Structure formats: C-alpha cells, structure tokens
Design a protein with these regions (language model features):
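Solvent-exposed interaction patches of small proteins and small membrane subunits
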Residues: 1-134
C-alpha cells in the first residue's frame, strides 16, 4: 500500500500556525486577520482532500468515498479516531468557511477569525493521527 503524502497539509498547517500566533498578539491588525482567514480557507480545503485520499488509500471504494456527504465524511473520521472535535464543531468550521468564501464582511471576518485557533488545533491533531497510522 502506497504511503500518503501529507506535505500539502503539513505546509498549509505550518503557515496557518504562524499567522495564528501573530494574530493572537495583534487581533486588531486587519492585514494579519485577512491572512489568517485566507490560510484557514486553503487549509480547510486541503484537509478535506486529504481525508478523502486517506479513505481511498485505506481501501474504501473510491465511488463510495466520492459520494460521502460532509457529515458522513466527518462521522467516518470520528469512527476512525482521527478527529478531536465532534460533528457540531466541524459543521461550524464548514459554515465559517462557506460564509467567508462568498462575501467579505467585517463582522463575518471577526467571527471566522475567532474559530481559526480551534481549527488549527483540530488539524494539528488530525495530522498527528494520520501520520501515526501511516
């Protein structure tokens, strides 16, 4: 079985972690907040792609994986003990990602930036679990 390549997720997580630390020190800096949100967006996307690849690599049927809804994918990852948080928290991450991707609004940006540190911790946990199983 071929090993999964986690490089994209590792790199995006590292970049997100750097801006999370900067943002914690200066949350009023809109340039830093914008960077935080953008890095959240692409790390979120890479995370979902990585989970799908993981499921396929671990002998799930490709067509079945491609048909998984978001909720089913999160539940499957939870059953495999890959996630720290529950479906409700992952739904919040998804909602924040969807809100910010359609329009830019100051209040939405503040709301999204508020959950990014939790997201960072979650993806750090996920990556450790994925690499531990690799």
């Amino acid at each position: 079985m071929e090993n999964l390549d986690f490089t994209a997720l590792e790199n995006s997580l590292q970049r997100l972690g750097k801006v999370v630390e900067i943002y914690k020190k200066n949350p009023q800096d809109t340039i830093v907040r914008d960077s935080l949100i953008q890095r959240f967006e692409f790390t979120y996307s890479i995370t979902l792609k990585t989970l799908r690849k993981y499921f396929i690599e671990r002998a799930f049927i490709v067509d079945d994986v491609n048909k998984l809804s978001f909720n089913e994918m999160v539940r499957t990852a939870m059953q495999l003990n890959l996630l720290k948080s529950d479906l409700a928290k992952w739904t919040e991450f998804r909602e924040m990602r969807n809100l910010i991707s359609h329009t830019y609004d100051e209040n939405v940006a503040l709301k999204v930036s508020g959950i990014v540190p939790d997201f960072y911790e979650e993806i750090t946990y996920l990556l450790k679990e994925l690499k531990g199983i690799k």
